Swiss-Prot record:
Keywords: Secreted, Signal, Virulence. Belongs to the CHIPS/FLIPr family. Its main location: secreted. It comes from the Bacteria. InterPro entries: FLIPR (IPR023256), FLIPR/CHIP_sf (IPR038529), FLIPR/CHIPS (IPR023253). NCBIfam families: PRK13033.1. This is FPRL1 inhibitory protein. The keyword Transmembrane does not apply. One of its GO terms (cellular component) is extracellular region. May be involved in countering the first line of host defense mechanisms. Impairs the leukocyte response to FPRL1 agonists by binding directly to host FPRL1.
Length: 133
């Protein structure tokens, strides 16, 4: 009888250790998945805010019959991305009265780099023309 109790205790310990290990793995996996969901949600929220902001800028320009204006390079990128149609990979935007630095080139197949997002656009930011490639 003593052997059976010892075997039962050892088996219970092994099973408990296995369950504990599985539980920790499940917690780690769940935590990892949860972080991924939070990141995806934040990106979706940011995209929605950007889209609403660009819609507002474009509607205001359409209402006043003025060229589209952008304050930052990110605004310019989002306007170009919204206006692009079909299989457009690159766009070159020319700013009105911008001088020698009046061209901005965007690769529309990738998101805009973080270090370019908050750069101010030259002059008043009015778009003179857009060349699609």
């Amino acid at each position: 009888m003593k052997k059976n109790i010892t075997k039962t205790i050892i088996a219970s310990t092994v099973i408990a250790a296995g369950l504990l290990t599985q539980t920790n793995d499940a917690k780690a996996f769940f935590s990892y998945e949860w972080k991924g969901l939070e990141i995806a949600k934040n990106l979706a929220d940011q995209a929605k805010k950007d889209d609403e902001r660009i819609d507002k800028l474009m509607k205001e320009s359409d209402k006043n019959l003025t060229p589209y204006k952008a304050e930052t390079v990110n605004d310019l990128y989002l306007i170009v991305k919204k206006l692009s149609q079909g299989d457009v990979k690159k766009a070159v935007v020319r700013i009105k009265d911008g001088g020698p630095r009046d061209y901005y080139t965007f690769d529309l197949t990738r998101p805009l780099e973080e270090n370019r997002k908050n750069i101010k656009v030259v002059k008043n930011g009015e778009i003179d023309s857009i060349y699609w490639d």
